[in-house]
Regions:
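Extended, helix-rich architectural segments
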Residues: 1-138, 452, 456-460
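C-terminal helix-loop subdomains that flank or include functional centers
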Residues: 283-286, 292, 296, 315-319, ...
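Generic detection of long, well-ordered alpha-helical segments
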Residues: 106-113, 236-247, 318, 362-365, ...
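Hydrophobic alpha-helical segments and helix-packing faces
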Residues: 29, 33, 49, 62, ...
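Short amphipathic alpha-helical segments that mediate assembly, nucleic-acid/protein binding
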Residues: 4, 17, 21, 34, ...
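Extended, regular secondary-structure scaffolds
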Residues: 120, 124-232
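Short, hydrophobic/amphipathic alpha-helical patches that form generic packing surfaces
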Residues: 82-93, 126-128, 244-259, 266, ...
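Extended, charged amphipathic alpha-helical segments
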Residues: 210-345
Length: 460
């Protein structure tokens, strides 16, 4: 693992920087973090590597292993990891972040909520992700495309290398990010790596004129490094950790069950008084039986043909699969919605079912808040408060009735906000308040009676 101090020590010239960049990329690709990130993303795509790479083996009489190409080899993969990740992200971030100052989102380009979800989705999958803030834009760097250079003294991120190559026959692109700017590099096929663009500052000021068009006149950098690490919990690990083995066990048992059912669909025939038939004769006999569906048996000589089928035991497998599914959700602190979908469930029962996922969401949202505070520092946002509107399965009518039953104990503004959150319309809070204000003014105007005109007319 190379650090920021290694970079300062080795990258003293342009040539040394290029050598360091190539060495850092190669080491990163061969690191455990990179390999685990690749594996975790395969599980996220429902291409669970343990079962996909499994091959059934037979052993000869001498003990030599050979590949089993005769029996069924189904490979069924579960989708637990994708569901757990998606549930966590959508639960806390699905309705977007709620900023106390509504104008904060205007400081960012594009949909900031979508970008934050992407960053923390990859943080949950791969252990860590990186958010690059630059001039209002927030970009996600994944573990599989970014080499972090950590400071040995304080553990902070001081530099990094982003790299990408769409195909082995295409150029390798790399960008070196430092505190004082970034430099772009390229390595084309059969060519040494070279500088593509010299170091540039992060913040650029442009000037437009009729003669010269738009040109950059000056630039500056941020007070801190503009790439921020993001984690999904204080464990600082992929959410696959701890549940991978259970997912693998589920896949193996389910696939094994499918294989046994496939193999057991065969009908086995017991031939009696046919000891004179060798393997070739038996094969010919079975082929004729399958083709004509008729068999000639000399019963007088004691011959007989009896079919047999195998009943595959399934009760114990079903029980264990159900147990594994429950354990996976419990260990991931996720919500198994099958337990709250049946019947008319009360709000109290729903809240109890959400206990684990609420605890996990508390820890997750702490990481989001820490990340956003660093983003705000770069964006020049001060004293901003963030709240989360969690997406829940609720007994809406019961919750609204509870809010309304408080009477005058709670302010009307608070009750309206809570009801809008339950209805999923929290983003329309200002609009609703404006409508209520307009209606209130209209009613006041209607209640004001015009003054009577008591002026007496003049006599002619």
């Amino acid at each position: 693992m190379l650090t920021y101090q290694d970079f300062l020590r080795e990258a003293t010239t342009d040539e040394n920087k290029i050598n360091f960049i190539q060495k850092a990329i190669n080491q990163h690709i061969n690191s455990d973090d990179y390999k685990k990130a690749v594996e975790a993303y395969e599980y996220y795509r429902q291409r669970n590597t343990a079962i996909m790479q499994y091959q059934k083996i037979l052993y000869t009489v001498t003990g030599k292993p050979i590949e089993d190409v005769f029996s069924a080899n189904h490979k069924t993969t579960s989708n637990f990891f994708y569901k757990i990740i998606t549930q966590m992200i959508q639960y806390s971030l699905g309705n977007g972040l709620i900023f106390e100052n509504e104008n904060v989102k205007e400081k960012f380009t594009g949909d900031i909520d979508l970008k934050i979800k992407k960053i923390f989705r990859y943080a949950a999958i791969e252990k860590i992700a990186f958010g690059f803030y630059n001039n209002g834009n927030l970009e996600c760097f994944k573990v599989t495309e970014f080499v972090p250079l950590w400071d040995e003294e304080d553990g902070s991120l001081k530099a990094g290398i982003r790299f990408w190559q769409i195909d082995s026959s295409k150029p390798l692109r790399a960008t070196l990010f430092e505190l004082d700017g970034y430099t772009e590099y390229i390595r084309e096929k059969s060519q040494p790596m070279r500088i593509l663009k010299d170091k540039q500052k992060y913040i650029k000021y442009k000037q437009t004129s009729e003669i010269y068009g738009t040109e950059i006149i000056e630039g500056e950098n941020y007070p801190t490094f503009p790439i921020i690490p993001a984690y999904c919990s204080d464990k600082k690990q992929s959410m696959l950790e701890g549940i991978k083995e259970q997912i693998d066990a589920y896949d193996f048992i389910k696939s094994g069950f499918a294989n046994d059912l496939d193999d057991a669909t065969q009908i086995y025939w017991l031939l009696q008084n046919t000891g004179g038939m060798d393997d070739v004769d038996l094969a010919k006999f079975m082929q004729r039986l399958k083709t004509t569906k008729i068999a000639n048996i000399d019963a007088d000589e004691g011959g007989a043909l009896t079919p047999y089928t195998v009943q595959v035991p399934y009760q114990s497998r079903e029980v264990y699969l159900e147990r594994l599914e429950k354990d996976i959700y419990n260990d991931a602190m996720a919500l198994n919605v099958s337990g709250i979908q049946a019947g008319n469930i009360t709000a109290t029962q729903i809240k109890a079912a959400y206990e684990d996922i609420n605890l996990r969401a508390d820890a997750f949202e702490e990481q989001v808040l820490e990340f956003m505070q660093e983003v705000f520092e770069l964006a020049g946002v001060e004293n901003e408060k963030i709240t989360f509107n969690r997406s829940k399965v609720v007994n809406t009518s019961e919750e609204i009735q509870t809010i309304l039953s408080t009477g005058d104990l709670l302010p009307i503004e608070y009750k309206i906000k809570k009801i809008l959150a339950l209805l999923g319309d929290v983003d329309r809070t200002k609009e609703v308040f404006d409508m209520l204000k307009a209606e209130s003014l209209a009613m006041m105007n209607q209640n004001v009676e015009p003054e009577e005109d008591n002026t007496e007319g003049e006599e002619a």
